[in-house]
A protein has these predicted regions:
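Hydrophobic alpha-helical segments within soluble ligand-binding/sensing domains
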Residues: 107-110
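Nucleotide and nucleotide-moiety/phosphate-recognizing core
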Residues: 2-102, 112, 116, 120-126, ...
């Protein structure tokens, strides 16, 4: 079984914020699907091309994501290399996507929490660049909404994320996948 977890913060006030890119990609992939609730997470189990896949959106705050991910991993007996965590990344430019396995937290507290509770960083991270506005407080920036121009770039990322998620499900993802969207041609 594969686990695909999108990180974000629960609640209407956080919808469409930079920190909720993980939720946005999960929602886009699934479309309008009713998710069940367990272990403080919204989840749905699907069979995609014969592969069992668990989609998860933790309903704790980002910094406590590991407390939600770990019970699902234990309950469903999921190997860490079968986990994909979708998250925002301040250190990547807006529109850059990077997928890496066995990577550190890079300062992301949600990933730190997951590494701590799993006792391993041997999982895939699907990092979506949101840039970093050094002129703004980091917390205010990541909890801020995307501008219309930024959303155009993010829409490209979201549109292509399905193929990257499918590649993970089918065991065809390359650990160093790196793509750019929204660049001037």
């Amino acid at each position: 079984m594969k686990l695909i977890c999108g990180l974000g913060n629960p609640g209407k006030e956080y919808e469409h914020t930079r920190h909720n890119v993980g939720f946005m990609l999960i929602d886009s992939y699934l479309g309008v699907e009713k998710m069940s609730e367990k272990f403080n997470g919204l989840f749905i189990q699907k069979i995609i091309d014969g592969e069992k896949v668990l989609f998860l959106k933790p309903q704790s705050y980002m910094n406590l994501s590991g407390n939600v991910v770990r019970p699902f991993v234990d309950y469903y007996k999921i190997d860490t290399e079968d986990i994909l965590i979708i998250r925002d990344d301040l250190d990547l430019p807006l529109g850059r996507v990077r997928i890496k396995r066995d990577s550190s937290s890079g300062g992301d507290n949600g990933i730190k929490s997951i590494i701590s509770t799993l006792g391993s960083q041997n999982f895939y991270q699907f990092k979506v660049g949101i840039s970093n506005d050094k002129n703004r407080d980091t917390k205010d920036y990541v909890l801020g909404k995307f501008s219309k121009e930024e959303m155009k770039i993010l829409d490209e990322v979201i549109g292509d994320s399905r193929s990257l998620i499918d590649a993970f499900i089918h065991g065809q993802i390359v650990s160093t996948t790196d793509r750019n969207y929204g660049e001037k041609k």
